[in-house]
C-alpha cells in the first residue's frame, strides 16, 4: 500500500472509530438511544469551573512546603535547571496528555485506556490504586491543620511556652535561645522547643515505633471526620457542585499567600532568607539526587498519573480549547511554587535572625515546615494568633481542593466502569459516601499514637515518585508508539481547531520516556530505607509492607496485560493485534454494561479492526 493511501486509511479509521458522532457524547450508550434518552454526560457549567478545579487540584501543599525546601537543598537557583527540563520534557506534556484524552474519549482514568489500547488498560487501574492510597493519607495532613486551626483561636498560642501539661523539663522557650552562647551550652543537653513538644507530645502523642500503635487520638479522629464530611458534601453532586466550591477554595489561598508574602518580605532578616533560598550552587547538579528530586517534584505538583486530570478533562465540552488553558495552568502552578519560596524563606530568615542561628538550622520540609517551623515563626511576630489562623486556613484550603479533585478523579474512574448501575438515582452519591467512609476508617490507623509512622510509610512508598514515573512512561509509550501521536493530533485538531506544535508529540515519543526511565533507575539505585527523623529505623516487615504498597499499583500494568491476553480467544499474535487496536465506542459501551464480553470476539463485522501505528503495523 502506498504511503499516501496508508495515511488516509489511518485517518479514516481514526475518524470512524474514535470520533464521536454528531450530537452525541463520546462513548454513547446504545440502550439509552433505544429508550429515546440520549446520554448527557455531566459537563462543566463554564470554562472557569474547569480551570479553577485543575488549579485547585495541583496547586497544593507540595507547592508551599516541598518545592522551596528542595530548591534550597539542591543548589538554590541551580535547581531550576533540572526543574525546567523536567517541566517542559515531562510535566507539561503528560499533564496535557491526560487532560486531552479525557476530553477526547469522555471517559475517566480507567475506561479511556480501554478505548485507546485495551492491552494497556492496566495504566488506568495503576493510577486508581495510587490515588486511592493517596486519598487515605493525604487527608491526615488536613486533620492536623484543622487541629492547629482550632488551637489557634486562643489569646496565647499553646505552642509558645513550656507551661503546659505535655511539656517536659527539657523544654526551652525561644526567648532563651536569643542568647547564642547560652543556647550553644544548653543545646548539648538535648533541650527541645515548646513547638516541637506540642507537635510530638500533644498533637501526635508519638509512640516508640510503628509496632507500638497505642490508643486512638479522638481529637484527631474527629478532625479527620470533619474533613471527610466537608469533602463529601462538596463533591457529592458531581462537577456541578465541585465547580462552584473551587471558586472559593482555589482562589482564597492565593490571596492569603500574597498577604504572607508581603508580611514576610517586610520582616528583618528576610533578605538573608531569600538569598539562602536562591543562591546558586552549580556543583550540586553533578549529584543524581538533585535530578531525582526535580523529576518527582514535577510529577507530584502536577497531580499527574493519578487519573484525576483525565477525569476532570472528561467533563470538558468536545470543542473546548484545553491546550491553551493547560499551558496557562502550568505557568500558574510552577509560578506559585517559585513565589511560595519567597514567602516561606523570608519568614525563615526572620526566624533565624531572632534565634541567632543559621537558616539551615530552621529550614524544614513537609510536616516539619507546616507544624514546627512556621508555628514557631508566628510566635515571634506581632499578632501571632492572627498570622497562625491565616496560615492554617491557607494550608487547609490548599489541601482541601486537592483532596476534592483526587476523590472526584477516583470516583469518576470507578463510576465509568459501571455507568448504567452507578449513575442511576442516588447511587453515585451513595458510592461516594462509601468510598469516603472506607478511606476514613483506613485513615484512623494514622491518628493513633503510632499513626505518624504509618503516615510516613504511606508517604514514602504508596504514592512515591517511582510509582508515578512508572505510570507516566507507559502513558507516553502507548500514545506515541501504539495509538500514534499523529492520530491523537488529528483528534486534537478536530477539538480545538489547530494542531499543537511538535514539542508535545516529540516529548511523548522520546523525551518524557527517557526522563522517566533515567529518573526511575536512579531512584532505585539511590534508594535509602525509610527512617523517621533520621533516628527511628523501620523494622524489616514495615519496609516490606511499604514496597508492597508501591508494587500494588505498578503490578497493575503487566497483570492486566496477562488477564486480557488470557480472556481473549485465538492465536497469540491475533489476540495481541486485537488488544493493541482501539475499541469501537458503541460496542465497547455494550460490553461495559455487562453484555457478552466483546474481548472474546476477535472480529468486527467479520474482519479485524485496522491497526493504528508502528507496533501493530509491523505485526501485520
Curated annotation (Swiss-Prot):
It is found in: Cell membrane. This is Sodium- and chloride-dependent taurine transporter. GO terms for cellular component: cell projection; plasma membrane. Residues 1-49, 564-620 are cytoplasmic. One of its GO terms (biological process) is amino acid transport. Glycans are attached at residues 163, 179, 190. The chain crosses the membrane at residues 50-70, 78-97, 122-142, 218-236, 245-262, 298-315, 327-348, 381-400, 430-448, 465-485, 506-525, 545-563.
Amino acid at each position: 500500500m502506498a504511503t499516501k493511501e496508508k495515511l488516509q486509511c489511518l485517518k479514516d479509521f481514526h475518524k470512524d472509530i474514535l470520533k464521536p458522532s454528531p450530537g452525541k457524547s463520546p462513548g454513547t450508550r446504545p440502550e439509552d438511544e433505544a429508550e429515546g434518552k440520549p446520554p448527557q454526560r455531566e459537563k462543566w457549567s463554564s470554562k472557569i469551573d474547569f480551570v479553577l478545579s485543575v488549579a485547585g487540584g495541583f496547586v497544593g501543599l507540595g507547592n508551599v512546603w516541598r518545592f522551596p525546601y528542595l530548591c534550597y537543598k539542591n543548589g538554590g537557583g541551580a535547581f531550576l535547571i533540572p526543574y525546567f527540563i523536567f517541566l517542559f520534557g515531562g510535566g507539561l506534556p503528560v499533564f496535557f496528555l491526560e487532560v486531552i484524552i479525557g476530553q477526547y474519549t469522555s471517559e475517566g482514568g480507567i475506561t479511556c485506556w480501554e478505548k485507546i489500547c485495551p492491552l494497556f488498560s492496566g495504566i488506568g487501574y495503576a493510577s486508581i490504586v495510587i490515588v486511592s492510597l493517596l486519598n487515605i493519607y493525604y487527608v491526615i495532613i488536613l486533620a492536623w491543620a484543622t487541629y492547629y486551626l482550632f488551637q489557634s483561636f486562643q489569646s496565647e498560642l499553646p505552642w509558645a511556652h513550656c507551661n503546659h501539661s505535655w511539656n517536659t523539663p527539657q523544654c526551652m522557650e525561644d526567648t532563651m535561645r536569643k542568647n547564642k552562647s547560652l543556647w550553644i551550652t544548653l543545646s548539648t543537653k538535648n533541650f527541645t522547643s515548646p513547638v516541637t513538644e506540642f507537635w510530638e507530645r500533644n498533637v501526635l502523642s508519638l509512640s516508640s515505633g510503628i509496632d507500638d500503635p497505642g490508643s486512638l487520638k479522638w481529637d484527631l479522629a474527629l478532625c479527620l471526620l470533619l474533613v471527610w464530611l466537608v469533602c463529601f458534601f462538596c463533591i457529592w453532586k458531581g462537577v456541578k457542585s465541585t465547580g462552584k466550591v473551587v471558586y472559593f477554595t482555589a482562589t482564597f489561598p492565593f490571596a492569603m499567600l500574597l498577604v504572607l508574602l508581603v508580611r514576610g518580605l517586610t520582616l528583618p532578616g528576610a533578605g538573608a532568607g531569600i538569598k539562602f533560598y536562591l543562591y546558586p550552587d552549580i556543583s550540586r547538579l553533578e549529584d543524581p539526587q538533585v535530578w531525582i528530586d526535580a523529576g518527582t517534584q514535577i510529577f507530584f505538583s502536577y497531580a499527574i498519573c493519578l487519573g484525576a486530570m483525565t477525569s476532570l478533562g472528561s467533563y470538558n465540552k468536545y470543542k473546548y480549547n484545553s491546550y491553551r488553558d493547560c499551558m496557562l495552568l502550568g505557568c500558574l502552578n510552577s509560578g506559585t511554587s517559585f513565589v511560595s519560596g519567597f514567602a516561606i524563606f523570608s519568614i525563615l530568615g526572620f526566624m533565624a535572625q531572632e534565634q541567632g542561628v543559621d537558616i539551615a538550622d530552621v529550614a524544614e520540609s513537609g510536616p516539619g515546615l507546616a507544624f514546627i517551623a512556621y508555628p514557631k515563626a508566628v510566635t515571634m511576630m506581632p499578632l501571632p494568633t492572627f498570622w497562625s489562623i491565616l496560615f492554617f486556613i491557607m494550608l487547609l484550603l490548599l489541601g482541601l481542593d486537592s483532596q476534592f479533585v483526587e476523590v472526584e478523579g477516583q470516583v469518576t474512574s470507578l463510576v465509568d466502569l459501571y455507568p448504567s448501575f452507578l449513575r442511576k438515582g442516588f447511587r453515585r452519591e451513595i458510592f461516594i459516601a462509601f468510598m469516603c467512609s472506607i478511606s476514613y476508617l483506613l485513615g484512623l490507623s494514622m491518628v493513633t499514637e503510632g499513626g505518624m509512622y504509618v503516615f510516613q510509610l504511606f508517604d514514602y512508598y504508596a504514592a512515591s515518585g517511582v510509582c508515578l514515573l512508572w505510570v507516566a512512561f507507559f502513558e507516553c509509550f502507548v500514545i506515541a508508539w501504539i495509538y500514534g501521536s499523529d492520530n491523537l493530533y488529528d483528534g486534537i485538531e478536530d477539538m480545538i481547531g489547530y494542531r499543537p506544535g511538535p514539542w508535545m508529540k516529540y516529548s511523548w515519543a522520546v523525551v518524557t520516556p527517557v526522563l522517566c526511565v533515567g529518573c526511575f533507575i536512579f531512584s532505585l539505585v539511590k534508594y535509602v530505607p525509610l527512617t523517621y527523623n533520621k533516628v527511628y529505623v523501620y523494622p524489616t516487615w514495615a519496609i516490606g509492607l511499604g514496597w508492597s504498597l508501591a508494587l500494588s499499583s505498578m503490578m497493575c500494568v503487566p497483570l492486566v496485560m496477562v488477564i486480557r491476553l488470557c480472556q481473549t480467544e485465538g492465536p497469540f499474535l491475533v489476540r495481541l493485534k486485537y488488544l493493541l487496536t482501539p475499541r469501537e465506542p458503541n460496542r465497547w459501551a455494550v460490553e461495559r454494561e455487562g453484555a457478552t464480553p466483546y474481548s472474546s470476539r476477535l472480529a468486527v463485522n467479520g474482519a479485524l479492526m485496522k491497526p493504528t501505528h508502528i507496533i501493530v503495523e509491523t505485526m501485520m
